[in-house]
Regions:
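Short conserved motifs of the RecA-like P-loop NTPase core
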Residues: 2, 106-108, 181-197, 205-208, ...
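Walker A/P-loop NTP-binding motif of AAA+ ATPase domains
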Residues: 4-191
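Conserved phosphate/pyrophosphate-binding and hydrolysis machinery centered on Walker-type P-loop NTPases
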Residues: 7-12, 37-38, 113-114, 138, ...
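Hydrophobic face of alpha-helices
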Residues: 15, 117, 169, 203-206, ...
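AAA+ P-loop ATPase catalytic core
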Residues: 90, 103, 175, 190-216, ...
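Generic hydrophobic alpha-helical membrane-span motif
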Residues: 161, 204, 261-265
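Conserved P-loop NTPase/AAA+ ATPase motor core
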Residues: 210-293
Length: 293
């Protein structure tokens, strides 16, 4: 088992691409002998919390190269100069690898003509004769100029999607492995109740479930501990301190049950969770409950 499999659950095709890149960077002569032009960059795009930075750090470690990380920390006129400086340092230390974290935070506007993009493109082009491999991560490529995204600047562009199915179950199992789960809790039910959420969200939900369990003096992490955690973290639903109206609760329950019945008829086994709890504890209107399927 290599470090990609050791530290990252799922994402097999992504990991295989990263292994290939690492091999190219470690054994450049073997590839050059076959007439290969060395790749210059990798761009990883996904919603937050899906492991871009983790995978990038593993690639940097596996490459065996001198590594540098650059993030936008300061506002104002110094940023462009700092970006140029880090490219100069990476060039001096070549062969090297440079990680540009969170490109979406580099610019202050949604324009593809922003000066930050022009500066980044110039930095990449001006170091084209140096043995620098650039990794960049971003939450959104929509406002990046197409000229920056073309092969020759970023030869690899990888899109990470939220974990689904068995991968999501494996991630939940990993975060529950030391938390003494009750025997009647099914991992598949947990995943179905919060489809297409990030790895970081799964971790947060499982940790909060363990906190709920300990606070309630449960011997094991119970289903109610997990449900309360995922309703709060994933759906932003909390218990209300307002006076409850049993009749209104019943009406909402019937309404949501009807949604669930229709969902089950149309797609058997698709119902993930049903609740009458509303956003911020609200009862009534569009915030008065839902069914996930």
């Amino acid at each position: 088992m290599d470090k990609f499999d050791e530290k990252v659950i799922g994402y097999d095709s992504i990991k295989e691409t990263l292994r290939q890149i690492a091999d190219v960077l470690k054994r450049p002569e073997a590839y050059k002998e076959k007439g290969v032009s060395m790749p210059r960059g990798l761009l990883m795009e996904s919603a937050p919390g899906l492991g871009k930075s983790l995978m990038a750090s593993i690639l940097m470690e596996e490459s065996g190269r001198k590594s540098f990380v650059f993030r936008r920390i300061n506002e104002g006129n110094t940023f462009l100069g700092e970006m140029k400086d880090i490219f100069d340092v990476a060039k001096e230390e070549a062969p090297s690898i440079l990680l540009l974290e969170d490109l979406n935070l580099y610019v202050e506007s949604n324009s593809p003509y922003a000066p930050e993009w022009a500066c980044l493109q110039a930095c990449i082009d001006e170091t084209s004769d140096a043995d620098i491999f650039v990794i960049a991560t971003t939450n959104d490529t929509r406002y990046m100029p197409q000229s920056l995204l073309r092969p020759g600047r970023f030869d690899y562009i990888l899109n990470l999607n939220p974990p689904l199915g068995k991968t999501a179950e494996d991630i939940v199992s990993y975060y529950l492995c030391d938390k003494n789960l009750a025997k009647d809790v099914q991992i598949s039910d947990i995943v179905k109740a919060m489809p297409q959420v990030s790895c970081a969200t799964l971790e947060t939900v499982m940790n909060l479930a363990a906190i709920n369990s300990a606070y309630r003096d449960h011997a094991h992490v119970q289903k109610e501990d997990i449900i309360d955690a995922l309703l709060k973290v994933v759906y932003n639903l909390r218990k209300t301190d307002c006076e409850e109206d049993p009749q209104e609760h019943q009406m909402i329950a019937v309404h949501e049950a009807a949604h669930a019945v229709v969902g089950e008829v149309l797609h058997s086994g698709s119902i993930g969770i049903i609740t009458i709890r509303g956003s911020h504890g609200a009862i009534g209107g569009m915030e008065s409950g839902f069914a996930v399927y």
